[in-house]
Amino acid sequence: MRLPKLLTLLLWHLAWLDLELICTVLGAPDLGQRTPGAKPGLTKAEAKERPPLARNVFRPGGHIYGVGATNARAKGSSGQTQAKKDEPRKMPPRSGGPETKPGPSSQTRQAAARTVTPKGQLPGGKASSKAGSAPSSFLLKKTREPGTPREPKEPFRPPPITPHEYMLSLYRTLSDADRKGGNSSVKLEAGLANTITSFIDKGQDDRGPAVRKQRYVFDISALEKDGLLGAELRILRKKPLDVAKPAVPSSGRVAQLKLSSCPSGRQPAALLDVRSVPGLDGSGWEVFDIWKLFRNFKNSAQLCLELEAWERGRAVDLRGLGFERTARQVHEKALFLVFGRTKKRDLFFNEIKARSGQDDKTVYEYLFSQRRKRRAPLANRQGKRPSKNLKARCSRKALHVNFKDMGWDDWIIAPLEYEAFHCEGLCEFPLRSHLEPTNHAVIQTLMNSMDPESTPPTCCVPTRLSPISILFIDSANNVVYKQYEDMVVESCGCR
């Protein structure tokens, strides 16, 4: 009798527990009405407003975000996922970056967690004001859009070199075919020399009530020491701006100028020139021939000369004689000229090589880089090139050289352009007499006419060339006048 009673009580107790569980389930209004795709633990509103994420979306930092990406490792053999692990995991902050705190709303938190903001742009175009957000300095670094190249730093460019007015006048005089006018003081040296190098004075006057001595200093370390013919010093006498300072000695007598070398160590000063100073009505140049001294000092890196004026055994203020150097322009500074003639023919390519590098590869890179810079202006100016007449005989054709279009106007002063000409055309049998063919060219042309496949034709090449004078700035920033041979084609022939 007890066993049936115990079974009855047990069944009644189980029925009571089932009834209580059913009441609890019926009391949850949202149970069984979840929106498909919503995750456990979220309300209906959250499930509707939360956008689904694509699977296996790659994010910067090497992490993979997506539905089931985080929970895939937690799935069992049955494929079920616990609801607790569906909740977003809190990722540790990356090194170097500030920790972002969650906002007060779960909806805001979920939206922010899935918004990918490109670098340099904040959501809505505004900076975040939340606590723990990135500092303003970090945000400013992000303002540059991806792929935008950094602003290149402007390369250092040395100040432009202003040519001395005397060198410009010298170029105009010596480049003239008739050699009319100009300075006669350099006619002898210029007639023998093909190179004239100029050096600007780097000395400064002493500050004081009077200047008794002046030192003229020139850097000649980059001077070519071979084939030198002469040297001279040119100093400008300029009428003083201060009318209180007379341009002639107060006694009315003529002062004496003395030019000597600067004493150094055990080397005493050597007297170079003594001359009288006449009255100064205007500006003029005092020219001193110092070749005898310079022959002994040409291997030095620096040349120093000293100037002083005397009257009756007393030193005279040089500023009163028109030698004041304060606030003088480049074309008014003292100039040291060296005349030379090289025994071998100088190639213009050597000067280009000195400015661009040491090996031929660097030179060609320099040439092509300058060509690329000027390619657009050349294309716009020249237009289409006329087609060649392949049947024309060998003759001289036009070739206009423009150094500015080549990008060399930063170191070539004059001329900026000239007519070089070139040779073009066929060398066919019989060769004309004006082509001045050699005996070898005649035989080669005859063989080519008989059997073109066995013997190539002769070439149309320059047979006579002439020089031009170029005024340029060398690699040491000195203004140089130089005559380059074989720069202009005068006649063409078959060789």
Curated annotation (Swiss-Prot):
One of its GO terms (cellular component) is extracellular space. Residues 30-162 are annotated as: Disordered. Residues 142-156 have a biased composition (Basic and acidic residues). Disulfide bonds join C394-C460, C423-C492, C427-C494. It holds the Pfam family TGFb_propeptide. SMART domains: TGFB. GO terms for biological process: BMP signaling pathway; cell surface receptor protein serine/threonine kinase signaling pathway; chondroblast differentiation; chondrocyte differentiation; embryonic limb morphogenesis; forelimb morphogenesis; hindlimb morphogenesis; mesenchymal cell apoptotic process. Induction: Induced over 300-fold in tibialis anterior muscles 3 days following denervation. High expression is maintained at least until 10 days after denervation. Residues 1-27 form the signal peptide. Keywords: Cell membrane, Chondrogenesis, Cleavage on pair of basic residues, Cytokine, Disulfide bond, Glycoprotein, Growth factor, Membrane, Secreted, Signal. PROSITE patterns: TGF_BETA_1, TGF_BETA_2. Residues 28-375 form a propeptide. GO terms for molecular function: BMP binding; cytokine activity; growth factor activity; identical protein binding. Its main location: secreted. Belongs to the TGF-beta family. Homodimer; disulfide-linked. Interacts with serine proteases, HTRA1 and HTRA3. Following LPS binding, may form a complex with CXCR4, HSP90AA1 and HSPA8. Interacts with high affinity with NOG; inhibits chondrogenesis. Interacts with high affinity with BMPR1B and lower affinity with BMPR1A; positively regulates chondrocyte differentiation and induces SMAD-dependent signaling. Interacts with FBN1 (via N-terminal domain) and FBN2. Interacts with TGFBR3. It is linked to Defects in Gdf5 are the cause of brachypodism (bp) which alters the length and numbers of bones in the limbs but spares the axial skeleton. PANTHER family: GROWTH_DIFFERENTIATION FACTOR 5 (PTHR11848:SF44), TGF-BETA FAMILY (PTHR11848). Growth factor involved in bone and cartilage formation. During cartilage development regulates differentiation of chondrogenic tissue through two pathways. Firstly, positively regulates differentiation of chondrogenic tissue through its binding of high affinity with BMPR1B and of less affinity with BMPR1A, leading to induction of SMAD1-SMAD5-SMAD8 complex phosphorylation and then SMAD protein signaling transduction. Secondly, negatively regulates chondrogenic differentiation through its interaction with NOG. Required to prevent excessive muscle loss upon denervation. This is Growth/differentiation factor 5. The gene is Gdf5.
